[in-house]
């Protein structure tokens, strides 16, 4: 799960991976993260254990992949806006980001409360370094500061 923006999946593969992510999300309503087993996830997702292990080694990788898909969707939306949101520091851009991720607030808060904050902040940092730094030429430390601040305001 190392590469957030360059790994491409076909529609069927993406659907299977999202079923696994959605199953995990639903199970978080029923159990603590630590009590969820791979067998619970595959049963809920309607896939085999072999399919799960084809994509992931751990349930953390499944969470990471699901969250990365959310971030990819955000990137796609921002790129589709063709600059209408303004500079990424602008209020309109910040409000758009908060509004976009608010639709996933339950999932984000569940993974943060499960002790997986690192998955969220790593995805944020990867987005900033790979998508924002090349455009705005902002130093890494400033991007990390901005990302951490935005994420902490959100949660």
Identify the meaning behind each predicted range.
Residues 87-106, 144:
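Amphipathic alpha-helical segments that line or abut small-molecule/effector binding pockets
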Residues 27-61:
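Helix-turn-helix
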Residues 15-26, 30, 44, 61-81, ...:
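Alpha-helical structural segments
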